[in-house]
Amino acid sequence: MPGPAAGSRARVYAEVNSLRSREYWDYEAHVPSWGNQDDYQLVRKLGRGKYSEVFEAINITNNERVVVKILKPVKKKKIKREVKILENLRGGTNIINLIDTVKDPVSKTPALVFEYINNTDFKQLYQILTDFDIRFYMYELLKALDYCHSMGIMHRDVKPHNVMIDHQQKKLRLIDWGLAEFYHPAQEYNVRVASRYFKGPELLVDYQMYDYSLDMWSLGCMLASMIFRKEPFFHGQDNYDQLVRIAKVLGTDELYGYLKKYHIELDPHFNDILGQHSRKRWENFIHSENRHLVSPEVLDLLDKLLRYDHQQRLTAKEAMEHPYFYPVVKEQSQPSSENAVLSSGLTTAR
């Protein structure tokens, strides 16, 4: 009879929540204050998810454009968790800003009110991004991830749909904190999180003692899809096939090494479908259409993110220090860069 899986803990920010008061992370005890939804007039439907419907709206008290996320009937505990996390992260770098929590006066349905972002659909946007754009937006996303991780929170659903980009204003926001959770060392978490193409190997092999590094895998998948112009990069037909797609790139021997290290027993179904695959070189994915987006630096970064072993993946802070981002850091350290954008807008207006 195989023993239990080996333990694991985050390499960074592991004790953040134990150093805070219980009130910070005990979301079940949180009592959100619900305002009146009548202050907001719904303008148009922006989309719908598994747990909500999202609308563009106007705050009639100040004419401000906002986004209203009307929550579908779901466990109170889940709503409390999302609200508590959004309140804890309020004001964080590139984190979507929660403006209000309201309820419909009649139906009593809860809704979350957020800042409005003039988002471009990623399927169109990713086709026009330059090499520098990709570096820039990935760096901005890393700021959001380092911030939430430093606050003891894993997002657990990083994917293009949850990264709003206003390309004209070069503004990025990480949205949809409905699956986010507080990190406590040695806690075993639900593996039914994240979206299939962005699920880390730990989820696919049912390893529950995961941590912030799960988000770094998802970010790696996004980066790969952007630089190789292959959306999604790992295109599994189901959760089993998803691991097969990953193994065809990262290799099966490497997968077995990971399983051995953490004493993970693989679902027997994998015996029939995994096969044997060698590790592929990242250069294999370069072709004429994506060559202008690929550099030795980005392949090195990608290689350090897309690792089976979650403990080996770069942390958000480590990733931000990677040479791939030097051009972005250089631009952001020049105080004139923002003024230049402003003045270029002004010169035409004069």
Swiss-Prot record:
Chain ranges of the Protein kinase domain: 40-325
SUPFAM superfamilies in alphabetical order: Protein kinase-like (PK-like)
Transmembrane segments: none
InterPro entries in the cross-refs: CK2_alpha, Kinase-like_dom_sf, Prot_kinase_dom, Protein_kinase_ATP_BS, Ser/Thr_kinase_AS
Residues annotated for ATP binding in this entry: L46, G47, R48, G49, K50, Y51, S52, E53, V54, K69
Reactions it catalyzes: L-seryl-[protein] + ATP = O-phospho-L-seryl-[protein] + ADP + H(+); L-threonyl-[protein] + ATP = O-phospho-L-threonyl-[protein] + ADP + H(+)
Active site: D157
Gene Ontology molecular function terms on file: ATP binding; protein serine kinase activity; protein serine/threonine kinase activity
Function: Casein kinases are operationally defined by their preferential utilization of acidic proteins such as caseins as substrates. The alpha and alpha' chains contain the catalytic site. Participates in Wnt signaling.
Family membership: Belongs to the protein kinase superfamily. Ser/Thr protein kinase family. CK2 subfamily.
Quaternary state and interactors: Tetramer composed of an alpha chain, an alpha' and two beta chains.
Protein name per its UniProtKB record: Casein kinase II subunit alpha'
Organism of origin: Gallus gallus (Chicken)
